[in-house]
Amino acid sequence: SALIDLLDDNEFMFVVGHEIGHFLFGHGLARIETNSDSVEFNIQQRAQEISSDRLGLLGCQSLDVAIRAMMKTVSGLSDEHLRFDVGAFLRQLDEVPQVGINSASTHPSIFVRCRALLWFSLNDAYNRGGDKFSSDDLLRLDRQIQKDADKFSDGPARETIPEAQE
């Protein structure tokens, strides 16, 4: 497969961990019960991608590797065509203005996904080996990620939901 040729072993571990996350969280089940054409469904899908990215990070154990894997899978470009300076990329995330995303997209922008992984990697539980995350830690983390998601994509999408306008 092209994906196997594109990624090194550690990057592939991120992708495998991400996909296992979808399975463990039961993400495929929501498609059965939800209108897949709705804005709400797409917001939920974007949140599920971020949750699964966390398991991908736990699988590869490296923020740099996780971000490289995402950059490669989003662009389809290999190492020879990409210059990886993950630190510079992360610094640019603070300078990025609001990046619009199609409200029908099921995946958050790479900016939101990378910021979410950065926030997750800064969590004390992750740095202790990712064995025990308190619900308070995860709630704080989720609130921070929600701010980013609202700024870059979900906020404008929510405004199109009729119930949100009342």
PLM features: residue spans?
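Pan-zinc metallopeptidase signature
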Residues: 83-166
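Short amphipathic C-terminal alpha-helix that caps PH/PH-like domains
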Residues: 16-20, 114-117
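Short amphipathic alpha-helical coupling elements at transmembrane boundaries
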Residues: 14-15, 54
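Alpha-helical membrane-targeting segments
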Residues: 32-40, 99-104
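Catalytic Zn2+-binding segment of zinc metalloproteases
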Residues: 2-13, 19-34, 64
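Short helix/loop segments within enzyme catalytic domains
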Residues: 28, 35-94
